[in-house]
Every structure is written in structure tokens, then in C-alpha cells.
Swiss-Prot record:
Keyword Phosphoprotein: no
Family per similarity comment: Belongs to the RNA methyltransferase RlmH family.
Subcellular location: Cytoplasm
This protein's name: Ribosomal RNA large subunit methyltransferase H
Any GO molecular function: rRNA (pseudouridine-N3-)-methyltransferase activity
Assembly mode: Homodimer.
Reactions that this protein is recorded to catalyse: pseudouridine(1915) in 23S rRNA + S-adenosyl-L-methionine = N(3)-methylpseudouridine(1915) in 23S rRNA + S-adenosyl-L-homocysteine + H(+)
Gene, per the UniProt record: rlmH
Source lineage: Bacteria, Bacillati, Bacillota, Bacilli, Lactobacillales
Record has Coiled coil as a keyword: no
First-level EC class: transferase
Function comment: Specifically methylates the pseudouridine at position 1915 (m3Psi1915) in 23S rRNA.
Amino acid sequence: MLNIRILVVGKIKEKYFRNALDQYLKRLSRFTKIEIIEVKDEATPEKASKSENLEILQTEGGRLLDKINNRDFVIALAIEGKLITSPDLADMIREIPLDGYSTIDFVIGGSLGLSNEIKNRANAKISFGRITLPHQLARVLLTEQIYRSFMINEGSPYHK
């Protein structure tokens, strides 16, 4: 069975995001082993300098990299990533195991995004649009899209 891990910076604080996330995680359990791995976020000063922001990105990126295994297929969610559709993601999720991978790691950054180290480690960078999303909402959106991918791949009418 395919393992999917969603690596994220920070925790979900709002109950409504948690409830939505839990609903999709429950639905996904019949298709895949899925887990969310949270790493500590760094406090970002309101008027942080470029170097302070870079240091925060590198610290958070290091925490994420520590959780990624060498044999995992890594997909970074990045605003500059390839714009994809739901069927595109479904194709990726179906095809990645055919290349010998048993684990897909989706990575969502914190308020400053992802470090270059994470982007360089990623096997693919994808984007759901050129907008900035709160990482809590991005987590729910990604989880729903992963569920939608499995439904597309089994030919379910959910996608319509």
C-alpha cells in the first residue's frame, strides 16, 4: 500500500480546519496510509530583515528535511511550482509507485514558504494557483485533492 505523508510547518489552531482535515483523512484511510507530520514553526518578527527571514526559512527547512527519507518521492507545494489540475495530481499519485516509490511526501512551508534546500530536494514542485494560502488552509486543500485523486483513479463520480 502506498504511504502518503504531508509534512508541514506549524500546527492547526482553528477547530474548523482540524474538522475538515480529519474528515478527509478518514476518507483516505481506505486507499492509503496517510499521516501528517508537523514541525515547529519559527516566530517571524513583523519587520524581519531579509537575513532574518532566510534564517527562519533555513531553520524550518532543516526540520522538514530531517523528516524526509532518501527513498521518498517529494512533492513541494510552491507558488512557483507547476500549475496542475486534479486529474494531473491523480496521474502523479497513480504513476509514482510504478517508478518504485512506496512513499510520497507532500511538503507545505510556513508563512515564509519553503527553503531552497527543500525545493532542491523535491522531485516535483506543484502549485494550486498563484495565490498565497494560509498553511492551515493549504493543508486541507491538499488533503481534499489527494482524496479526489484516489476517487478519480477509481472512476468514482465524486470528481464531477
